[in-house]
């Protein structure tokens, strides 16, 4: 008998040990990410063919202390490799791990290769060749700290490669993990099984193979142990033949039904092809369908629902996924009372959207990603109970009620004002610390960074509830909900892009057509708190030469142009925003030489500018230290210097509309008087209804020459 290591994923060691015991192994001992045992050739052949959970089996030839490359070489060269494989066989070394002395796995593999080759040469035998592409033999080395395991891989390519899945959907599960999920789900071979998000069908195919008692390796054509010196072909042929007979008989005896749904027709075709290659196509019924609306099949008494829904990149906070899990949970309760469900996901927050209490849960890894598998018993409930539990105001009821109230008040006002975009919630309740803006049929939810004393998991769960409630209360489609995190921006971060979606839309504001981008930047291209300021600028602009500084996307310029300005000059440092401003003007038919656009540092431009203007709008940042600006700018510190330069450009009867977002900004009235300027605070007059709770969102001043 030889010593073996069955390799598996962390968390599956005990399950694999149970499986090996059922396959006739007497001393299966779980270790980290594996199971140790002794076996004859016949036993290990059977394990390789029948194990659903092991990723590979390694014949352990040596375990040793490895504190240097010489330790590695000596341990390798001391093994009689001639007894393992013939010199005509090609081999490769799979070296996993490093330590302080062996810092590179390629170097470790080279030392092992040297030891093996030298062993053959010492016996006056030809050197076996290396082949990374098509090796006959794979040498397995695992190094952790100063402990090393050296052996021969018995299988070759990982055992998850069953041979039925050459292609898959976007996020495939490994077959070994899929088998583990099925085994942990509580499903038994007599029960019907349904996967409402089946993708390429792996979960269903693995379950169907279990029900048919089909060996998972039965379709596999090549095994490394067939190239070893002690290979017993007659024994192996008998084991394979027995497995083939069992599989043929098993498929005919399966009584349970398997159902797979997916909303991607192309992926469903892949699933059907995979099932056909696996030999279980007649057992599985694949249909086009959505998990949020899936209905219970007729023959599904005591059935089990198992699935691996999408997780997303930013775990637990994608509006579309939150809506999917919420709707799926509602559908499970509405359609599948008396059944059980087992859901595998990396996001506990998303699983919470199911609104079901798990009876069992397990931790597993999907590759390097930690995941949860939760098992649920779905209670039988009346329609009234389901409606009451999952109604629009059942999630975060305080928040939902406030949002509903705000929508009634602000929505009516916005319609009257001819506004497509407005704020319906702005951290009204401290525990629900977000802002929510409507852009036509879209929602933008901006999460303010949670205080450091709020645990991250609690903040995530609360945000999940906010998104779920917002979708249900507003009726906005989940794929039209955009989530952003707003926190204090510093340095370059304040200008960084968030994504590359580049999906623009046109909104209406008091008759002006304005282009917004809800996805790519923290801000959308339109500061909603200034809608009344922009309208006033339009009313003041008739016949005026208008200057817009720190212009951003030029929305104020659009209002001025539509209001009858004789000319407009739009200045911003960002070429991206300046091009955006040009697009805004074009969308409103404001085209011509009288509309100028200048890419420049506004502060430097001001010092050199020579023109004269009747109306100037300036909305500088509170603070800026852009690498393209020579000096930093602080609006409180520098506003008088700013006014001095603006005065020079302002005609005798002209007006400056000066705004900024610094809370508690104080105009230096004494210095303004010395400059010969009058300043009047009009902040309360420029505050729209949707920002009425946030009195300090901006401050706004009308500045004129002192009469």
Swiss-Prot record:
PROSITE patterns membership: THUMP, UPF0020
A Pfam match: RlmL_1st
InterPro entries xrefs: 23SrRNA_methyltr_KL (IPR017244), DNA_methylase_N6_adenine_CS (IPR002052), RlmKL-like_Mtase (IPR000241), RlmKL-like_Mtase_CS (IPR053943), RlmL_1st (IPR054170), SAM-dep_methyl-trfase (IPR019614), SAM-dependent_MTases_sf (IPR029063), THUMP_dom (IPR004114)
Coiled coil spans: none
Residues of the THUMP domain: 43-154
Recorded GO CC terms: cytoplasm
Subcellular location: Cytoplasm
Enzyme class: transferase
GO MF, one example: rRNA (guanine-N7-)-methyltransferase activity
Alphabetized UniProt keyword annotations: Cytoplasm, Methyltransferase, RNA-binding, rRNA processing, S-adenosyl-L-methionine, Transferase
EC identifiers of the protein: 2.1.1.173, 2.1.1.264
Catalysis: reaction(s): guanosine(2445) in 23S rRNA + S-adenosyl-L-methionine = N(2)-methylguanosine(2445) in 23S rRNA + S-adenosyl-L-homocysteine + H(+); guanosine(2069) in 23S rRNA + S-adenosyl-L-methionine = N(2)-methylguanosine(2069) in 23S rRNA + S-adenosyl-L-homocysteine + H(+)
Principal cellular location given in the protein's record: cytoplasm
Matches recorded under HAMAP family: 23SrRNA_methyltr_KL
Function per UniProt: Specifically methylates the guanine in position 2445 (m2G2445) and the guanine in position 2069 (m7G2069) of 23S rRNA.
Family designation: Belongs to the methyltransferase superfamily. RlmKL family.
Protein name as catalogued: Ribosomal RNA large subunit methyltransferase K/L
Taxonomic path: Bacteria, Pseudomonadati, Pseudomonadota, Gammaproteobacteria, Vibrionales
Gene (UniProt): rlmL
